[in-house]
Amino acid sequence: ANAVYEGTDAVMLSGETAMGSYPIEAVRMMSQIAEESEKYLDYMFYQRRKVSAENLRNISNTVCYSSVATASDLEAPVIVAPSVSGFTTRMLSKWRPKALIAGLSPSMTAVRQMQLYWGVKPFHAKRAESTDALLFASVELLKEKGIVKEGEIVVATAGVVTRANRHEPVADTNIMRVMVVE
């Protein structure tokens, strides 16, 4: 429980516990303790903490912070974060939102890495041709998986290519959109 309260992204069993007579039960118990502990976190503490001036001028950091604050203000249960590399989900995770972060990526490497990020539930997803198609497909996948329901408000954030930089990779998380699940 202390590891959760201190903001740890992941916990693991010690060698002795993992090799003991009941390793599966030990993992289940650790999971239950972590999930129960998360119910009592002061999520606003993470949003109120001081941020360096350098991070305040960082586009990705600011968009992710704004997404977390908006999700909190609107009581959105999910932040939708499509990301090829998982960068957006990692940036969101550092703010420890109360909302679930749904990380979606076409890269299985990124999906596996996102399993270690705090508050992120990763999903494998296909690439999309446009920003609208990306966000629509992301929400549809989450609807199919039972993560979001019709009528819920979700906050979506991603790094998308602009028309001016169409041939360059996305370097920043640069959009946030508030959506009602249809």
Regions found by a protein language model. Give the residues of each.
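Short, small-residue-enriched loops and turns at beta-alpha junctions
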Residues: 17-22, 53-57, 131
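Generic secondary-structure signature for well-ordered alpha-helical cores
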Residues: 5, 9-10, 31-43, 68, ...
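Glycine-rich phosphate-binding active-site loops on the catalytic face of alpha/beta enzymes
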Residues: 1-23
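Long, charged amphipathic helices and adjacent flexible linkers at domain junctions
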Residues: 30-67, 175
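Beta-strand/loop-dominated core regions that host nucleotide or nucleotide-derived cofactor-binding catalytic loops
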Residues: 121-124, 136, 140, 162, ...
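Conserved, mostly hydrophobic/aromatic
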Residues: 3, 92, 154
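C-terminal helical cap(s) of enzyme catalytic domains, especially alpha/beta-barrels
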Residues: 17-39, 169-179
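Nucleotide-binding motor/catalytic cores of P-loop/tubulin-like NTPases across gene-expression machines
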Residues: 88-90, 96-133
